[in-house]
Every structure is written in C-alpha cells, then in structure tokens.
C-alpha cells in the first residue's frame, strides 16, 4: 500500500465524517420509525393472541371434519411463508430469516416432503428466486403502501385455497419478531393445521355457553380472520424488528466511524509531523551547505 500524504489522509478523514453524518441521521430516522411501529405492534399483539385463543377454544369443542381448514392430514406437501424486509442496511436481519428458512426446507426435504415458498419482502425474492425453489407467490415493496389487511387477505386467500383443496398439508410462517428494543428473534410458527392445546377446564366452561348462530359458523368466520391477521401481525412484527435492527446497525456504524476518525487522526498527525521534520532537515542541510 502506497504511503498516503497528509492531504490524502485529511481527505479520507473528511469522507469518514460525511459517512458518519449519514449513519447518524439514519439511526435517528429508524428510532422515530421504531417508536411509531412499536405503538402499532402493541395494539396488534393482544388481538392476535386473543383471536388464536378463541379459535383454539372452539376447535376443542367442534368436530374437526366440519371445516377443511381444521382437518389434519399426513404432511407430504408443505408451504412456507417467508417474511423479510424490502431493504438492507439492517445488520443480519434478513440473513437470519433466510438461514432459518434454508434449514427448515432442508429438514422437510430430508423427511421426503415437497416444499413450496410464498415470499414476502424484496430480500426474500432476491435470494430464493431462480435457485430451484418452488415459489408459489412473491411480493415486493409492500411495507410502505400495502402493509394492511387488504394485502394479507390476498395472501391469506391463497393459503386457505391451497389448504382447503389439499394442495398443501401444512403451512409454516417464518419471520423476525421484536423481543426488546435491542433484540429480535427469528420465529418459525405453524399456521396450519391448527392443533388445539387441550384444556379440559376450558372445554367445560365453553360447553356452558350457547353460541349463535352456531359454533361452526362462528369458527368459519374466525378462521378467515385468523389467517389474515396472523399474516398482518407477521408483517408488523417484521417491520418493527427491522427498524430496531437498522437503528442498532446505524448506531454501530456511527461508533465505528468515530473510532476510524480517531485512528486516522493519529496517522494524520504523525504524517504531518514527519513532513515538518523532513522540511526542517532540508532547511538545515541547505543552510549548512551555504555556510
């Protein structure tokens, strides 16, 4: 590596400072978006959990053969809904989901099962497309304008149709979820079939109620909401975790830039000192030569 002049080093320091200003601004933007996203997430989680509890309770109470979405079959064909971000600059946020998905696909294929993917998020599409995976549907650029129940109803309709018509025997959902402001985890959740957790205390309580028009009709409506809202929650969870991951990544980048500035400033001072020393020696030598 060629030795840099003080001017080159100074230019390099200025470039790092410019980058630091950008990462600092991106951290501030991500922090603001994170606060807004957390408010939406805090409103989404309780409804999602209560909806699941209702379906779980009713599924214990009814004949599972009354609705195709409740039927449990041997798993020969499996669909995986993969949720990533559209953008990068968020550390290992997207790579965690992709790595987990690859592991799940390998596990299922080694068990002799056919695996199909539904991709949500540009990073998932970019990675899995044209690599030999069976892709049923792919969606990009959905977080800005399409992160709503209208979009999840569209995807949910595909999932429901495939399960009802036995095109798939199980559906898994893989996405990142926010744990704390500084941490997130990649979750693998089974959407279908719904396998209720038997609670005979609850079963006794439910049997006391008269459900109108009938438990079957109520359950059918809830199942539609369940698919759509679980997908919606996955998008909200992923979006919130993405903002947190990007905020952390930009904070780390800002700090790393600060450390780099310190190191290059020391190098600059040494180079300038060497240049001054060299000039002084040249002046002294010239003076001695004149004498």
UniProtKB/Swiss-Prot annotation:
The lineage of its organism: Bacteria, Pseudomonadati, Aquificota, Aquificia, Aquificales. F-type ATPases have 2 components, CF(1) - the catalytic core - and CF(0) - the membrane proton channel. CF(1) has five subunits: alpha(3), beta(3), gamma(1), delta(1), epsilon(1). CF(0) has three main subunits: a, b and c. GO terms for biological process: proton motive force-driven plasma membrane ATP synthesis. It comes from the Bacteria. It is found in: Cell inner membrane. GO terms for cellular component: plasma membrane; proton-transporting ATP synthase complex. This is ATP synthase gamma chain. It is a peripheral membrane protein. GO terms for molecular function: ATP binding; proton-transporting ATP synthase activity, rotational mechanism. Produces ATP from ADP in the presence of a proton gradient across the membrane. The gamma chain is believed to be important in regulating ATPase activity and the flow of protons through the CF(0) complex. Keywords: ATP synthesis, Cell inner membrane, Cell membrane, CF(1), Hydrogen ion transport, Ion transport, Membrane, Transport. It holds the Pfam family ATP-synt. Signal peptide: none annotated. The keyword Ribosomal protein does not apply. Belongs to the ATPase gamma chain family.
């Amino acid at each position: 590596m060629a030795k840099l002049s003080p001017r080159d080093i100074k230019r390099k320091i200025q470039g790092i400072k410019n980058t630091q200003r950008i990462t600092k601004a991106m951290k501030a933007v991500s922090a603001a978006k994170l606060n807004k996203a957390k408010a939406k997430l805090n409103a989404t989680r309780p409804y999602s959990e209560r909806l699941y509890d209702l379906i779980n309770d009713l599924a214990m109470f009814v004949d599972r053969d009354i609705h195709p979405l409740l039927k449990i079959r041997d798993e020969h064909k499996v669909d995986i809904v993969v949720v990533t971000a559209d953008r990068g600059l968020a550390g290992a946020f997207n790579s965690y989901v992709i790595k987990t998905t690859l592991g799940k696909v390998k596990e299922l294929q080694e068990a002799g099962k056919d695996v199909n993917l539904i991709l949500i998020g540009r990073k998932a599409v970019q990675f899995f497309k044209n690599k030999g995976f069976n892709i049923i549907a792919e969606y990009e650029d959905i977080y800005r304008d399409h992160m709503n129940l209208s979009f999840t109803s569209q995807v949910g309709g595909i999932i429901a149709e495939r399960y009802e018509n036995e095109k798939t025997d199980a559906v898994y959902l893989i996405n990142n979820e926010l744990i704390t402001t500084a941490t997130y985890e990649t979750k693998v959740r089974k959407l279908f079939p719904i396998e209720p957790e038997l609670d005979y205390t609850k079963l006794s309580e439910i049997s006391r109620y008269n459900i109108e028009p009938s438990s079957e009709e109520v359950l059918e409506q809830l199942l539609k909401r369940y698919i759509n809202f679980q997908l919606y929650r996955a998008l909200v969870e992923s979006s919130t975790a993405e903002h947190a991951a990007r905020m952390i990544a930009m904070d780390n980048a800002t700090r790393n830039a600060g450390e780099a500035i310190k190191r290059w400033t020391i190098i600059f001072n040494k180079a300038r000192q060497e240049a001054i020393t060299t000039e002084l020696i040249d002046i002294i030598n010239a003076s001695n030569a004149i004498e």
